[in-house]
A protein has these predicted regions:
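Glycine-rich beta->alpha junctions and the first turn(s) of the following alpha-helix
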Residues: 104-175
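Internal helix-loop-helix
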Residues: 1-29, 69-76, 87-88
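Short beta-alpha junctions and helix-cap segments that line functional grooves
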Residues: 21, 48, 64-66, 107-111
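A short, Trp-centered hydrophobic/proline-enriched beta-strand micro-motif
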Residues: 28-36
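Short Gly/Pro-enriched turn/cap motifs at secondary-structure boundaries
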Residues: 40-43, 67-70, 84-86, 112-119
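A short core secondary-structure module
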Residues: 62-106
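Residue-level signal for inorganic ion chemistry
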Residues: 14, 63, 95, 125, ...
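A structural signal for short hydrophobic beta-strand segments in well-ordered beta-sheet cores
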Residues: 50-53
Length: 175
């Protein structure tokens, strides 16, 4: 979680969000996830259907996500949601949701072939209310933020896969 979620809070979070969450991420007190993928939309970040509607001082989130790494055990989730569904990619925003927020359900743990130590799950949001201060960066900039951070995330995952493959090859040769 420190390679994937922490950079979003570090780069786009307010000073208050950084002070509240980054120490908890570093200490391991909180487990985090980022909720992008949706049933029916896959990883098409412009086609996200989850919405976050501003209601006074809160955003009200509705929608669902699937194949979310760390989703089952996460205490804190970055949710990719449409704050302006008519604006396409420019209507996408990122919001922090704590797992104990009413209306948030972590669903079931999904079965996987590999990486069994890392959970993957569905997430459901039904009238989940979060303070508007939980918005990362500016409303409507979420897609741009994702495009900025995803290359580093993908590189981190690729390096881990390559290191695992090299280790497996070496263990095989040694055997």
């Amino acid at each position: 979680h420190s390679d994937i979620v922490a950079p979003y809070i570090l780069h786009y979070g307010s000073e208050a969000l950084k002070h509240k969450y980054l120490p908890q991420l570093i200490s391991g007190e909180r487990v985090t996830a980022i909720a992008m993928t949706e049933p029916g939309a896959g990883s098409d970040l412009q086609g996200v259907k989850t919405t976050a509607v501003l209601d006074g001082d809160e955003y009200v989130i509705n929608g669902s996500k699937t194949f979310i790494t760390n989703g089952f055990l996460a205490d804190l989730v970055i949710v990719v949601a449409k704050t302006d569904p008519k604006a396409g990619a420019k209507g996408t925003s990122l919001l922090l949701v704590e797992a104990d927020t009413p209306g948030f359900d972590q669903g079931k743990r999904l079965e996987k072939v590999g990486m069994k130590a890392q959970d993957t799950s569905e997430l459901f949001f039904q009238d989940v209310r979060v303070p508007k201060e939980n918005l990362l960066g500016q409303a409507g900039m979420g897609f741009a933020y994702l495009m900025q951070e995803l290359p580093q995330e993908r590189l981190t995952v690729a390096i881990g896969a390559l290191a695992s493959a090299e280790a497996a090859l070496q263990w095989t040769l040694d055997y």
